[in-house]
Amino acid sequence: MIRGSEGKLLAVVALGATLSGCGGDWQNWFETEKVTPAVLTQPDSASQLTDYISRATSAGKRVRMTGNGHAMSDIAITNEVLFTPDKLNQPLNLDRSRLKNPSDPGLVRVESGIKIADLNTYLDAHGRALFNMGGYDGQTLAGIMSTATHGSGLGFGPVTDSVASLQMVVDGGKMVQIEPSNGITNPATFNGRLEENSGIAVQLIQDDDAFNAARVGIGSLGVIYSVTLNTDQKFWLREVRHEIKWSELKKPGGYLDRVIHGLPVYGDGQPSPEHWELQYTPYADANGDHTFLITDRYHSYTPLPEQPSSERGQPGTDFASGLVALLGQPLAGILDTFPELAKPVLETTLNAEIDDNYTNVSYKVFNIGVVNDTPALAVETAFTLDQVSAAIERCFTISDAAMSQGIPQTGPIAIRFVKQSSALIAMQNGHNTAFMEIIELRAGKNAKKLLGMHQTAYRQEFNARPHWGLDLNSLTSEAQARALYPDTWDRWKTQYRRFNVSGTFDGKVTDRLGISVRPR
């Protein structure tokens, strides 16, 4: 007898069937997107993925796979068949007999739904590490891949640039293994079968455009089953945080100028941090200047002291961050009522993070900690490096204009630097990139309005690219997307149509962009 969600799935995707009310609600972490799909289920194997997707294609149903809900946009959702990744979260065997270089120690294979926190724990136990990551580790690997999520440091691309190979279930329930043209797999020793289940055929595709489309596919080419990653050996980070004024930071030959031009940040003979980022308040001080916090992170392959998070920043910072996470809603209400208080709040927040030395294993330094639990909204925008100073100063004017309307900026603004990527619609495609992330307390009555003001200005004035996940669904036509990716959009779309022949992986995002194979 077929029971539970599997039975519901078979019912809803049976050819010609109609069924409602058997799924349940799904909502993202930001509470900006909520759907009641006809089916909401957790595939637990490649066999289930291929079977469910085959049936969905036959019935003309749409399928999407969520991550952990940390995309603010509609990228992950559908009203039809929605998968969640909770049961596809394990490390997998890598059959090294299939590889061109079987002895490569850096290759690791995992299921796509593994959370970054669990991936880090697994890698650490095996003496390995991610080269770089963002400040939050609760996301799934497939989620951060598909949206080109990143850390900071111009020596490192987005996390998806560490992908060596991926296995994906595409239209009709077919499993494909996609790699670059010079991929890691030896076609002569590849047996065309899935490692975990020899009953599942796998087509090896070694093609640059297919690979560069699939690894940032915004969930629209198929459902990723497994990922093989290139990893680094385990390393530690020393973090230093210090304040500087904008007038000093931006001057010709100053720190920002040196970073943009690939020069040693602190001058010849001084060590340069591998990871460099900024936080700032958009509000001027009494002298008309702005406070910035620089975060330097230096690599060490020699073990460093592994300090507890309570020793990071000024005394009490960890406790204060936890308090903000707990009291986000009342704090937002206070700042809505007394918006001018946002100015000292932001200055105090930056001051609290100053630290002349914090060390730990890499992934514990990359993770910004309890502040991730703060109920917030966020948008992120990608600029070319030569735009970053002008973009920051435009941010000042937008924030001042909003404050004049009683709309405060309720969190520090971050600037991160990321190496260019060959993924076709990664925000980093074609050039090194500076990202601006703007965070607002979720309960602020005008939070979305302020974020929208920023997004609109940056796209219209800079032709800047919105992050695929941290976005208020700001792109509403294919023409807008093509203008942002003039050299690569049509190449990506060709692969989208190649693997999504029947429209199985259409979704709200493809409807919004006007590219769905079968529009609803």
Residue ranges and their predicted role:
Residues 1-9:
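Bacterial N-terminal signal peptides that target proteins for export
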Residues 364-371, 446-450, 456-520:
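Activity-critical C-terminal alpha-helical subdomain
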